[in-house]
Amino acid sequence: MKQVFLSTTTEFKEIDTLEPGTWINLVNPTQNESLEIANAFDIDIADLRAPLDAEEMSRITIEDEYTLIIVDVPITEERNNRTYYVTIPLGIIITEETIITTCLEPLPVLDVFINRRLRNFYTFMRSRFIFQILYRNAELYLTALSSIDRKSEQIESQLHKSTRNEELIELMELEKTIVYFKASLKTNERVIKKLTSATSNIKKYLEDEDLLEDTLIETQQAIEMADIYGNVLHSMTETFASIISNNQNNIMKTLALVTIVMSVPTMIFSAYGMNFKDNEIPLNGEPHAFWLIVFIAFAMSVSLTLYLIHKKWF
């Protein structure tokens, strides 16, 4: 899919032509769409389609006619009826006339620009647009990390009494997400630092310098949060694995003790079911023998139960 946007000081609209000062947004573009843009702006098609590889690393490539910036952005995906965070590459290409973004699927990081929910955003201010995207991306990482933290607290409350593996598996999924986030954030940080350096060929104004510095701070804060949450999740995973095992052991112990208590009346009643001679059966001839035997069996079971409770085995 190809979208072309143009903004002025008074309006923001989608157009059909490739004009100077536009923003071209490519979402999983076809080969023909890629060739059209590559030929129009003298871009190597391999660079244009590089962000469509989900394994592409964050980097900056500087060519004579354009600069390619690739960063990892967070998105959500559904697996096993649950929502998880993953990262995919976003490519940003800046030329003399336009800015091009390319990715595998629609991204939340670009929605605020498409829906015009961000102030001081203009497609013709290409450098600032790049820094605004990077800043918004850092904010999304912080939001995603906060969401992961809340989710881990919910799982923690369920795990205290759990004997199942589902919650533990979900906790491990969150831990894996944090690991991917940390890797993506650190490569994004290197890209941002390179943009802030004097060797960057992207023109920056004073306001842009401040925005880029804020972006670096937000990214570093996200890295610190990911480190903290990652350590907490790792500890939680190990701790609750032991808790689940302990809960299962307690259930097995309870079942074993119930079996012992129930075996007392079973042994008594089984004795009366054996082939004794009439004069050998205890309480033979007693008119209330049945109820007396039941009472004795019940009393012995209760006594055994109280003894086990006293010993804190129950």
PLM regions and their residue ranges:
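Peripheral, non-transmembrane regulatory/ligand-interaction domains of membrane transport proteins
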Residues: 1-197, 203-204, 214, 218-225, ...
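Hydrophobic alpha-helical transmembrane segments
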Residues: 37, 121-122, 196-213, 231-249
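Hydrophobic alpha-helical transmembrane segments and their immediately adjacent juxtamembrane loops
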Residues: 42, 220-314
